[in-house]
């Protein structure tokens, strides 16, 4: 054997040392001779991307998993290449064709925008000062077992962990999340911020200004001295802020608060309602009445904001029948009728007042199967103009003592609805982008649909372009004839307001165009023309206003609108 090795070495004379075989990877697969594991990985990624490009150019189907498996076997890789690694290796010429196949979590931008959630610093809930304590079910906050977390969060949710890593710096949170989405293959030309972490408007004004200023600066790249300057530069930035959502409470959603949020570029509010019963609000220590909820909905909508409510089934002393009746009232009573909904089934988490009730047997959650059934029945009640954003909290299951046992509650509820012959017709379920991703269905015959309803002392018109045969929603517009609660001087008098304009489908860059995508195909302009006709002919309004995201103001200027205060306004006479 030694002689054979020497001969193979090609040298003369003495015995040559044995050549060591390449180290096998996990599973016993041997790396190609002379390649380190890192070099083998780079070659495997290049081979996968090259094969994808070739198949795409020939118009053949691309089986990404098969290509990855073959490359891993050939190069003896212990771990398959990540999507982020493959996205970085795609040549510029092939990016348009290959990125949709490589995009991680495509649902992130299926609604046409990239959502960036950020958190303010930990602070105490404001109603401790008036009620002496927080809500009985609320975890987190500086006084809780999760002391470095914000109020109502544990610090272990994905958004919380990103915020903690950034030490709650708003600029770092926003910039790192945008860069992460970009690495995952998403278009981040259009960004919507969601401000989480408790009641933002209860924080000191100077901190709020610092936080908002840095969010806008993260998009524009400019270092601003104040919010007004930051908003101005953000309007012209390459990455557009098309909307901003702020979490608040009814007692921090009054006229002065609304005016301040408009100056920040805020377009949507998330308001904690939890229950439509006064006794439940009192027993759970909410610190406000249900009547206050109805009042703040009126004020918010008459200022043009979109309103998303948080509701909690399975609260103490409620029961199945009252829970279902509560949601029925929420959808049918004009005093509520929010534009969006987050359903948060009650969770028992250590350190809360509810945990103490659970320990002593004074509170028990619904059994898992019953909860799925209740959520299914709630989803069947949702009107077609309401969007269900979430169906459960993002709190990791190991931290939940009692309550929801599965992380896919929406999926289970939709399956139960199918068994019961029920259908969910909320906005999210019918969105074109969601339908394309989940069911590979694309709209065919598109028509304009109009729905009118009374809500919060005003006249609401929900305009949409839909494929009514397949029940697919392409775009929507929310138009309101304001009631008597107008607090903004720009809206006083005979004025109608567009509270939302949104065309669905995978995000397309602001100045881009893609014949295969639904955005930038003229649906938004058609919806605005119909809204102007209704405002002029039916509302008898003299002008129409739009609550516009800072980055979308140029779009409305092209349609003849001008900036007036925080709104884009057009005269109709």
Curated annotation (Swiss-Prot):
It is found in: Nucleus. [4Fe-4S] cluster binds at residues 125, 135, 138. One of its GO terms (molecular function) is 4 iron, 4 sulfur cluster binding. GO terms for biological process: cell division; DNA-mediated transformation; organ growth; regulation of auxin mediated signaling pathway; regulation of leaf formation; specification of plant organ axis polarity; tRNA wobble base 5-methoxycarbonylmethyl-2-thiouridinylation. Its EC number is 2.3.1.311. Pfam families: Acetyltransf_1, ELP3_N, Radical_SAM, Radical_SAM_C. Keywords: 4Fe-4S, Acyltransferase, Iron, Iron-sulfur, Metal-binding, Nucleus, RNA-binding, S-adenosyl-L-methionine, Transferase, tRNA processing, tRNA-binding. Binds 1 [4Fe-4S] cluster. The cluster is coordinated with 3 cysteines and an exchangeable S-adenosyl-L-methionine. Residues 422-573 form the N-acetyltransferase domain. It catalyses: uridine(34) in tRNA + acetyl-CoA + S-adenosyl-L-methionine + H2O = 5-(carboxymethyl)uridine(34) in tRNA + 5'-deoxyadenosine + L-methionine + CoA + 2 H(+). PROSITE patterns: GNAT (PS51186), RADICAL_SAM (PS51918). Pathway: tRNA modification; 5-methoxycarbonylmethyl-2-thiouridine-tRNA biosynthesis. Its cofactor is [4Fe-4S] cluster. InterPro entries: Acyl_CoA_acyltransferase (IPR016181), ELP3 (IPR039661), ELP3-like (IPR034687), ELP3-like_N (IPR056591), Elp3/MiaA/NifB-like_rSAM (IPR006638), GNAT_dom (IPR000182), Radical_SAM_C (IPR032432), rSAM (IPR007197). Component of the elongator complex. Belongs to the ELP3 family. NCBIfam families: ELP3 (TIGR01211). This is Elongator complex protein 3. The gene is ELP3.
